[in-house]
Regions:
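N-terminal, positively charged, Ser/Thr/Ala/Gly-biased leader segments
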Residues: 1-29, 170-193
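A generic structural signal for short, non-catalytic loop/turn and secondary-structure boundary residues
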Residues: 4-7, 35, 132, 149-151
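Short, Lys/Arg-enriched charge-dense amphipathic segments
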Residues: 5, 49, 79-83, 147-149, ...
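Short hydrophobic-aromatic micro-motifs
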Residues: 13, 72, 155-156
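Feature captures the catalytic cores and cofactor-binding loops of soluble hydro-lyases/lyases
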Residues: 25, 32-134, 141
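Acidic, glycine-rich flexible loop/linker segments
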Residues: 115-193
Length: 193
């Protein structure tokens, strides 16, 4: 799935620091390698009790994927074990991007490779968004800018290769396969006699 060059959405706030990958998708749901269908397990332990009954008081029960495609969370988002299932679950649940002041390195890498945009900004931006749930934002991949309505514009780190892959819905392997002919031609031309 490709990420559009610009996403305009309202935010969904989770004012929690250190949300780890086991909270995003618990280990018992990691038995598949299919990306689709994992949204129902996203934040499962927060949304459902030990009997599988919905926790009606949990704010995630009110999440609206049609208008809230951007998750805002506390710092150190995605810490814990490395699992590609975490960005898969977030994407399948309906999020296109996550805004935080800090991401675990492996989670950030897995997200970029799987089409989920991690938007890392300064604490005061996250604090504003957490204090103003359901706030309109615009994320522009081309300029690596987050626009927070009524608050300002803020740059975020995004390398050009990741931006290229995100906007085309490809990963690193897809990129290599797409350019296989050019790579082979280069290798043939650079061989020493």
């Amino acid at each position: 799935m490709s990420f559009p060059g610009v996403v305009e959405s309202r935010t969904f706030s989770l004012p929690v620091n250190n949300i780890d990958t086991d909270q995003i998708i618990p280990g018992q749901f990691l038995t598949t390698t299919q990306r689709e269908g994992l949204g129902k397990f996203c934040f499962y332990s927060w949304r459902f009790d030990e009997n599988g009954d919905a926790r009606p008081d949990n704010p995630l029960q009110a999440f609206d994927a049609s208008s809230q495609q951007v998750l805002v969370a506390g710092s150190n988002f995605g810490c814990g074990s490395s699992r590609e299932h975490a960005p898969w679950a977030l994407l399948d649940f309906g999020f296109r991007a996550v805004i935080s002041s800090q991401f675990a390195d492996i989670f950030r890498s897995n997200s970029l490779k799987n089409g989920l945009l991690p938007v890392m900004v300064e604490d005061h931006v996250v604090e504003f968004l957490l204090a103003h749930p359901n706030h309109p934002v615009k994320i522009d991949i081309g300029s690596s800018m987050l626009t927070v309505e009524g608050f300002g514009e803020f740059g975020f780190p995004l390398d050009s290769f990741s931006a290229y892959c995100l906007t085309r819905g490809i990963d690193q392997l897809d990129f290599l396969l797409k350019n296989e002919t050019a790579i082979n031609r280069y290798e043939q031309g650079s061989k020493t006699p």
